[in-house]
């Protein structure tokens, strides 16, 4: 069963939305994971057209996917602070070095395309999207909710790029209530 991202989570524009969906294959709050086993990972990749029917995916491939996902989540967390997670960036660059990508030129266009199939091809497609988003400035808007119990990755559509929560009405409100209670208990003590 695929994880349903709450409708409150602002969706990134295509094709970055695919990367957002990939990172959101783990529901931190509910403890669910679409990539928990090879069959689930295969199903998710096929549903999202990242893995052909004939391509296989073993446990090592699943572990690689989870590592890429969690590296992207760490970078989305760093986007909250407009900082750099150097270790996550190094890890992503290591994955990118193994990603079989090629440049495809068209009339008035150029894009990165995968030069492989299977799990490495799927990772290459995701990293090509990250590359394009980093170039056009949309990557910095992909953020992980600051609520550690949530961590849905959302697209910060605010004009000044200061979005903090996947939803102000849910996670932002929870934070405000906790802060209020902490202030109140501190004043009572």
Predicted regions and their residues:
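Short linker/helix segments within small regulatory modules
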Residues: 156-163
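Residue-level signal for short amphipathic helical patches enriched in basic/charged
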Residues: 137-140, 157, 172
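Basic DNA-binding region of bZIP-type proteins
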Residues: 169-187
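Aromatic side chains
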Residues: 22, 154-155, 180
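Short helix-coil boundary/hinge micro-motifs
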Residues: 1-144, 151, 188-189
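Short acidic, gly/pro-rich beta-turn/loop elements at beta-sheet edges
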Residues: 33, 155, 176
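Residues immediately within or flanking Cys/His clusters that coordinate Zn2+
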Residues: 142-147, 163, 168, 174
């Amino acid at each position: 069963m695929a994880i349903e991202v709450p409708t409150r989570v602002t969706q990134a524009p295509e094709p970055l939305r695919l990367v957002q969906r990939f990172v959101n294959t783990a529901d931190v709050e509910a403890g669910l994971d679409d990539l928990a086993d090879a069959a689930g990972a295969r199903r998710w990749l096929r549903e999202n057209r990242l893995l052909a029917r004939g391509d296989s995916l073993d446990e090592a491939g699943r572990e690689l996917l989870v590592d890429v996902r969690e590296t992207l989540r760490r970078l989305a967390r760093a986007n909250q602070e407009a900082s750099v997670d150097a270790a996550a960036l190094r890890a992503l660059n290591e994955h990118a070095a193994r990603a079989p990508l090629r440049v495809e030129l068209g009339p008035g266009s150029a894009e990165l395309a995968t030069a492989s199939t299977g799990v490495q091809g799927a990772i290459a497609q995701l990293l090509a999207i990250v590359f394009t988003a980093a170039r056009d400035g949309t990557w910095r808007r992909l953020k992980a909710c600051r609520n550690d119990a949530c961590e849905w990755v959302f697209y910060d559509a605010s004009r000044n790029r200061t979005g903090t929560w996947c939803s102000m009405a849910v996670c932002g409100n929870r934070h405000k209530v906790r802060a209020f209670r902490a202030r109140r208990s501190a004043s009572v003590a």
